C-alpha cells in the first residue's frame, strides 16, 4: 500500500501542490513561491516544543525572509491530539496560551491537515517519498505505537510534530530533519541555499 502511494506523488517539485491558508480564502499554490527557499513544518499548538519551534520559525522568517526564505506551517492533530482545536481557534491558542504573551506567527499557517496515512495532504506524501527519513535521525519512528492513529503505516511516516522539510529555490526537497533537530539549527543549511539562489540570479 505504501509503495502504491508513490505514484500519487510522482512529482519532482513542490510546485504542483497547493493549500488553503488558516485564515481562509483561496488555496495558495506553492508554484507562486518559485525561486524561494522553503522551510515546511507540521506544527501543533500543544506540543512540548511548541514555544521553542514557533518562536524559532518566527525568528528565521524575520531575519531571512527578506533574502528569500519562506516558512510554512501546517497544523496537524495526528500526534498525541496536540492540535485538537478548530482552524479558527489556532491563532488565539498561539496568542494567549502557547507560546502566549500576544504571540503572532509572521509566517504562513495553513488549515489543519493530515501528514500520514490515506488522507495525508498530497504535499506531505510527496515530501515523505522524496526524503524518506530525517537526515539527523534515519531510524526515527513513532516511539509509542498507541499514538498511531492513521493507516496505512509506512516506513517514511512523519514521527511527531515539528518535523522539518527544507526545499531549495528550484522546488526540490533538499533535507528532512527530525522533531529533535531545533528549527534554528537549520539556519546554516538555509544560508547555503540562499547563497546558491543569489548566485543564480
From Swiss-Prot:
GO molecular function annotation: glutathione peroxidase activity; peroxidase activity; phospholipid-hydroperoxide glutathione peroxidase activity; protein tyrosine kinase binding; SH3 domain binding
Similarity remark: Belongs to the glutathione peroxidase family.
List of residues that carry N6-succinyllysine: 62, 86, 112, 146
Annotated protein name in UniProt: Glutathione peroxidase 1
Record-linked InterPro entries: Glutathione_peroxidase, GPX_AS, GPX_CS, Thioredoxin-like_sf
Quaternary assembly: Homotetramer. Interacts with MIEN1.
Gene Ontology cellular component list: cytoplasm; cytosol; Lewy body; mitochondrion
UniProt source species: Mus musculus
Amino acid at each position: 500500500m505504501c509503495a502504491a502511494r508513490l505514484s500519487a506523488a510522482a512529482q519532482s517539485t513542490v510546485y504542483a501542490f497547493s493549500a488553503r491558508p488558516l485564515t481562509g480564502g483561496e488555496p495558495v499554490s506553492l508554484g507562486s513561491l518559485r525561486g524561494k527557499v522553503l522551510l515546511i513544518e507540521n506544527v501543533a499548538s500543544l506540543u512540548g516544543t511548541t514555544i521553542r519551534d514557533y518562536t524559532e520559525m518566527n525568528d528565521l522568517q524575520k531575519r531571512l525572509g527578506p533574502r528569500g526564505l519562506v516558512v510554512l506551517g501546517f497544523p496537524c492533530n495526528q500526534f498525541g491530539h496536540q492540535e485538537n482545536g478548530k482552524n479558527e481557534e489556532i491563532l488565539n491558542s498561539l496568542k494567549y496560551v502557547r507560546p502566549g504573551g500576544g504571540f503572532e506567527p509572521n509566517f504562513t499557517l495553513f488549515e489543519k491537515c493530515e501528514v500520514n496515512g490515506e488522507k495525508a495532504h498530497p504535499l506531505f506524501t510527496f515530501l515523505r517519498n522524496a526524503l524518506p527519513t530525517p537526515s539527523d535521525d534515519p531510524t526515527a519512528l513513532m516511539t509509542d505505537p498507541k499514538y498511531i492513529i492513521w493507516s496505512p503505516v509506512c516506513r517514511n511516516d512523519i514521527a511527531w510534530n515539528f518535523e522539518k522539510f527544507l526545499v531549495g529555490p528550484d522546488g526540490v526537497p533538499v533535507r528532512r530533519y527530525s522533531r529533535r533537530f531545533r528549527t534554528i539549527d537549520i539556519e546554516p543549511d538555509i544560508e547555503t541555499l540562499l547563497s546558491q539562489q543569489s548566485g543564480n540570479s
